[in-house]
Amino acid sequence: MKNKVYIDTNIFLYAMLHHPEFGNACEEIVRDIGKMLFLSTGSNLVAMEILGVLSKIDPNKARKAANDYYKLSLEELVIDPTVIDFAGAINEVVNIRYDAIHAAVMIMNDVNTIITNDIDNWKKLSTHFKEIIPIIIDKSLSFVGSQMNVITPKNYKKWKETIMTTTNLI
């Protein structure tokens, strides 16, 4: 069975902008999304953040990039009022701002792995995850994980080798 993984906005931005340090790894991640090496997920918030950030550089390219995001082989996780409420509860425990929305939609869709370069917020969430579990239980969510797995561009290749071995893709 393939891993279900949420892809954070910064992965797409680093790939699109050919970031000098993380661009190559992020481009590989985006290619692997296309190859469906894992079950990739995202949300409208990712497209909004792509549009917002890239609009500061070039509004025309920003529009194209946001539209191209929807052409990827991603399962779109829906952000609705219950996700926003849960994100607010997460922020009351560990204030990670917009990333709480990403975390809430992940948890509500039983996704416990994120590929991101935003290490600080996700490390903060991971450290306080036990404090979020009672909220998950209170909201009757069926999240099976006991933690959030954070994959970065730097450790992506090693993680990819592990999942390919465990899912017999080699």
Predicted regions and their residues:
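Short active-site oxyanion
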Residues: 35-40, 73-75, 109-113
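PIN/NYN-family metal-dependent endoribonuclease catalytic core
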Residues: 5-7, 24-57, 78-79
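Acidic, metal-associated active-site segment
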Residues: 96-113
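Metal-dependent nucleic-acid phosphoesterase active-site entry motif
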Residues: 1-23
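Acidic catalytic patch
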Residues: 18, 70-92
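Acidic, PIN/NYN-like endoribonuclease modules and their adjacent C-terminal/linker elements
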Residues: 2, 108-170
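Alpha-helix capping/helix-boundary segments
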Residues: 11, 46, 83, 101-102, ...
